[in-house]
Amino acid sequence: MSELREAPSGASRRDRVPVTAAPRVGWVTTQEDRIRPPFSGRVRLRLVVAYRGDAFHGISPQPGLRTVGGVLLEALAKVLREPGGVDALALVVSGRTDAGVHAWGQVVHVDVTPPAGGLGREPFDTARLAQGIDCARVERSLNGMLAPHIAVRGVDVAPPEFDARFSASWRRYRYTVLNTRTPDPFLAGLSWHVTEPLDLSVMRLASDAFIGDHDFAAFCRAPDGVEGATTKRVVTDTNWEDTGSGVLQFEIQALAFCQQMVRSIVGFLVDVGRGRRSAGSVLETMAARKRHNSLAPSDGLCLWSVGYPTQLAPPLPLAGSGAGWRPLP
């Protein structure tokens, strides 16, 4: 069992609850629950990525669709002059995000062939990295190609035992609700606009019931034919914050989440805030294991940060604040 790193800024003391073993979920290139080091002659490149999910059909590459993963791999193949092209690259992500879902701290890794020469007219500064990859230049080149909907916040060469998915100790999502009478065009696509007044105190009370080891079948999309799939998860923290100007932010942390789990929980909690459900109905709904029908839209959901054991953590702090998730002055 991995120990948790320090929780993101603003997280409560419940972040220090240890995470027990739970099924790991997310999109990867293999279904085997183990870490594979890079093949000989390749290095493991790690990236911390932010993106606007409403511009893509999720992160997993899909033929004929514009996805975060597909666009990122194409850019990497060009920047690194990958001999085998984009087909020689496979992306492993810390957390799968569906269509419309954003990310601020998505961590990915990809095994690449170090370029024999340099980028552009100048050679790589091989003194920086023995592997011959100038990560600062890779970051600049990628951002020049991927803006404005994708931003690469950091690039480094990861140790071979690092895996963006399986090495993670926790994942933290943030959901933004705009609770105002009129919409805000500057938060469109980044929040769920709810016009009815919400009782934040009862929403906080209800959210506490999600903490712990539970079967979240009532709050998850049923797994599609995945052998050994389970809806049991361990939630270590939940938190609602009123940031002002009607912007409410819900954060939830766990080792792993099942599909649509966060959106289902937020939809349920907003119903509690509207007075349609009681704060005490969470455990009753869990026990029934019947999927409830209040699913929050994807617009407000963001993969906020991912934690790793200290020896495997990316050098870039993953907790931070994107301008799009703060109330405007």
Regions inferred by a protein language model and the residue ranges of each:
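Structured-RNA-binding interfaces characteristic of tRNA pseudouridine synthases
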Residues: 3-4, 14, 19-329
